[in-house]
Amino acid sequence: MSWISPELIEILLTILKAVVILLVVVTCGAFMSFGERRLLGLFQNRYGPNRVGWGGSLQLVADMIKMFFKEDWIPKFSDRVIFTLAPMIAFTSLLLAFAIVPVSPGWVVADLNIGILFFLMMAGLAVYAVLFAGWSSNNKYSLLGAMRASAQTLSYEVFLGLSLMGVVAQAGSFNMTDIVNSQAHVWNVIPQFFGFITFAIAGVAVCHRHPFDQPEAEQELADGYHIEYSGMKFGLFFVGEYIGIVTISALMVTLFFGGWQGPLLPPFIWFALKTAFFMMMFILIRASLPRPRYDQVMSFGWKICLPLTLINLLVTAAVILWQAQ
């Protein structure tokens, strides 16, 4: 068959990788929502969801059916186009951010030379979804939550990007595969410990997870910028949040903990185990820490995280220049 060229085979293999990896990411995000409720019940000495299926194993299926059949209601005075577009942008931007993550040698959807810049671009695109949702809902709580979320996300994305510059300087590349290969002897978490701490804090803030969930604070804003959403539109926001957790956890593993590298076990297993550990940390943080005031969150970012990232970057640059002499 002369029409089957090597280029076509390469394109088909890339599409297959994309479908497999993205389906796994969506599935992990969905199962994390169930696992979080079970673990929070364990941490708080109460029962989690345990009524549907054996030990609550079918709770996720029940939630999906319930959400699918809920009324897809749009407020009367909202901007219908932007209101509908917002959850789609939120879901796809967070999903596309995972495309640059190499889960094992040769298994990456988009092996870009500007991989880290692509991730930061997708993280910035998610801000538009929040602003669109808050403004188009024509609800004061929704708008206030969107303003909080956009200010918080844009602030912490500064620290998110600066915390990665030390890793980029050490690896000499923005390519994620090159960064993983540069950690063959020493993981970046050792020389870039303060960069990792800042990236972890900023990652939690960008995902709007507890204790940085002020944009969705139920006690203050009645669920924030997606208060008017229901049905599958709310489902896209809901699953998108957990996909963001999976993506940030995978990036922590890739950038600071050697990616797929490890002894004995296959590379994909090492990557999955490391990522699952950091996903567990997200849940443990939610169960352990109180929610600070919004002004405290912003003050912490600009007065502590920013100086820490700048000091880390200056020290990294000084060490690289000293080694080059």
Curated annotation (Swiss-Prot):
Catalytic activity: a quinone + NADH + 5 H(+)(in) = a quinol + NAD(+) + 4 H(+)(out)
Protein topology in the membrane: Multi-pass membrane protein
Subcellular localization(s) per the UniProt record: Cell inner membrane
Keywords, in A-Z order: Cell inner membrane, Cell membrane, Membrane, NAD, Quinone, Translocase, Transmembrane, Transmembrane helix, Ubiquinone
Annotated GO MF terms: oxidoreductase activity, acting on NAD(P)H, quinone or similar compound as acceptor; quinone binding
Stretches that traverse the bilayer: 11-31, 81-101, 114-134, 154-174, 186-206, 237-257, 265-285, 304-324
Keyword Nucleus tagged: no
InterPro entries with a match to the protein in the record: NADH_UbQ_OxRdtase_su1/FPO (IPR001694), NADH_UbQ_OxRdtase_su1_CS (IPR018086)
Keyword Manganese tagged: no
Listed Pfam families: NADHdh
Listed EC numbers: 7.1.1.-
Listed GO CC annotations: membrane; NADH dehydrogenase complex; plasma membrane; respiratory chain complex I
BP GO annotations: aerobic respiration; proton transmembrane transport; respiratory electron transport chain
NCBIfam families the UniProt entry points to: PRK06076.1-1, PRK06076.1-2
PANTHER family associated with the record: NADH DEHYDROGENASE SUBUNIT 1, NADH-UBIQUINONE OXIDOREDUCTASE CHAIN 1
Family: Belongs to the complex I subunit 1 family.
Assembly notes: NDH-1 is composed of 13 different subunits. Subunits NuoA, H, J, K, L, M, N constitute the membrane sector of the complex.
Function noted in UniProt: NDH-1 shuttles electrons from NADH, via FMN and iron-sulfur (Fe-S) centers, to quinones in the respiratory chain. The immediate electron acceptor for the enzyme in this species is believed to be ubiquinone. Couples the redox reaction to proton translocation (for every two electrons transferred, four hydrogen ions are translocated across the cytoplasmic membrane), and thus conserves the redox energy in a proton gradient. This subunit may bind ubiquinone.
The protein's name in its UniProt record: NADH-quinone oxidoreductase subunit H
Originating species: Escherichia coli (strain K12)
Lineage: Bacteria, Pseudomonadati, Pseudomonadota, Gammaproteobacteria, Enterobacterales
Gene behind the chain: nuoH
